[in-house]
């Protein structure tokens, strides 16, 4: 009995070779389409000047840089671009234990996320994508009970010690001791690197942040590495010693693409189901525009964090006011503005350039057997670049139209469209700014 491939090879005449060639061409086209289907596919702007309404099944995780979206919700900025949330009014309170499942099965379309947490799903599926970055996470830190009165990495550096010598001296008191860390896999690379490089040989005990915080406040822990920045901030405010953090490693450790520090760099953002993204491309652009509007607004007016604090406290186990949230953001995960996103997508020499960071993360996950080796590339996961670049392109096109409109005498209805376009432009909704400016110019 012939195999399928033998059957393909059997014909000898011209017709047979034509069939074979056609089959191979068809296979190539299908392969190209399959490849294209696993990338962000931009949509054309909608006709007309109205913004179509959209409801997003959205979830937030219990961290300061994962709940700032609540500011835009309370201010009505998502409503301005036609977006509402399911469940109303603020979406779902999610956590790291259920977020990937909720995204995969379609119970959520979009989630605030540390995107490497989605990578383990690539062993079986390639549905979850990182559609944007919001901040560089600097909260990975080894904190010590203040009663121990230990010297920090920064102090050893100030004394003149080199990187590895300072790290060994800092963590020497941890030799044979226990570090209480969070369950998230994203923390393991940081913990493993400092343990190996310092030679401390500490043991890891995994515990949820909320439980760890209770024990720390009771003085029943000596060394902790919480996942959540609000927990890190709360303990630092309570006097816990920041022995060494990820910022120290980035600043003083070895640099370059092959640096062992590269897999430790954490960039927080948004995860989404690719089926939703490529069926609602313009909704994604509008959502992201509000994200950058919030970031810009909080930098100009930090009192906006008062809107976020109660929501964050309600499921993070913290007791922060607006100033506490502001300090958490500024110290542990400063937000990235729209224009500063070029460091992720355009600046190949940047420490946080997505291809460098994600190549290192993927390599680390492969080494741990979490995902298959050689099957996944950064562009398979990170779709934020094409999305950001599309908004940059809409801004450029809108600038050109606005320049054209300045030299025109407009009817009142056209002038109203031009004025509204400026409002959308100021709120980073360059898609609708372009649509309205185009309508005004015609």
What positions do the PLM features span?
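Short, glycine-/small- and polar/acidic-enriched structural segments
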Residues: 38-208, 220-229, 242-250, 424, ...
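Conserved C-terminal helix/tail region of periplasmic/extracytoplasmic solute-binding proteins
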Residues: 358-442
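Secondary-structure end/capping motifs
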Residues: 280-375
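Bacterial N-terminal signal peptides that target proteins for export
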Residues: 3-20
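Short, solvent-exposed loop/beta-turn-alpha elements that line the ligand-binding surface or hinge
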Residues: 150-161, 251, 256-259, 338-351
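Bacterial N-terminal signal peptides
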Residues: 18-29
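Boundary at the C-terminal end of the N-terminal hydrophobic targeting segment
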Residues: 34-36
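Pocket-lining segment of extracytoplasmic ligand-binding domains
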Residues: 202-205, 211-315
């Amino acid at each position: 009995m012939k195999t399928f491939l033998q059957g393909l090879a059997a014909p000898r005449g011209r017709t047979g070779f034509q069939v074979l060639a056609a089959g191979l061409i068809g296979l190539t086209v299908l392969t190209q389409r399959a490849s294209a289907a696993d990338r962000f596919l931009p949509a054309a702007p909608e006709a007309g000047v109205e913004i179509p309404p959209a409801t997003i099944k959205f979830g937030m995780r219990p961290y300061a840089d994962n709940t700032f979206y609540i500011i835009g919700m309370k201010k009505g900025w998502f409503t301005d671009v036609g977006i509402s949330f399911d469940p109303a009014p603020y979406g779902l309170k999610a956590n790291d234990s259920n977020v990937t499942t909720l995204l995969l099965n379609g119970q959520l379309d979009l989630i605030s996320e540390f995107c490497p947490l989605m990578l383990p799903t690539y062993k079986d599926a390639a549905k979850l994508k990182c559609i944007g970055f919001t901040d560089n996470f600097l909260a990975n830190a080894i904190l010590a009970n203040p009663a121990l009165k230990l010297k920090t990495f920064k102090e050893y550096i100030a004394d003149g010690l080199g990187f590895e010598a300072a790290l060994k001296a800092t963590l020497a008191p941890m030799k044979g001791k226990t570090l209480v860390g969070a369950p998230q896999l994203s923390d393991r690379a940081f913990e493993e690197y400092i343990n190996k490089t310092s030679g401390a040989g500490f043991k890891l005990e995994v515990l949820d942040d909320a439980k760890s915080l209770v024990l720390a406040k009771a003085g029943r822990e000596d060394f902790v590495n919480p996942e959540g920045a609000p927990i890190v901030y709360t303990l630092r405010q309570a006097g816990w010693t920041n022995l060494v953090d990820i910022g120290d490693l980035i600043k003083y450790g070895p640099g370059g693409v092959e640096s062992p520090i590269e897999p430790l760099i954490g960039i927080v953002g948004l995860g989404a189901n690719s089926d939703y993204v490529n069926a609602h491309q313009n909704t994604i652009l509008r959502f992201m525009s509000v994200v950058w509007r919030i970031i810009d607004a909080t930098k100009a007016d930090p009192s906006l964090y008062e809107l976020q604090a109660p929501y964050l406290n309600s499921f993070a186990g913290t007791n922060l006011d607006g100033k506490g949230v502001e300090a958490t953001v500024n110290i542990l995960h400063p937000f990235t503005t729209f224009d500063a996103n070029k460091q992720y997508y355009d600046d190949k020499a940047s420490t946080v350039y997505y291809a460098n960071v994600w190549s290192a993360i993927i390599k680390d996950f492969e080494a741990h057997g979490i995902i298959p080796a050689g099957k996944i590339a950064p562009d398979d996961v990170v779709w934020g670049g094409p999305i950001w670049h599309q908004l940059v392109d809409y801004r450029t096109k809108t600038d050109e139209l606005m320049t054209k409109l300045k030299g025109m005498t407009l009817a009142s209805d056209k002038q109203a469209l031009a004025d509204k376009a400026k409002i959308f432009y100021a709120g980073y909704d360059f898609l609708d700014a372009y649509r309205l400016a185009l309508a005004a110019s015609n």
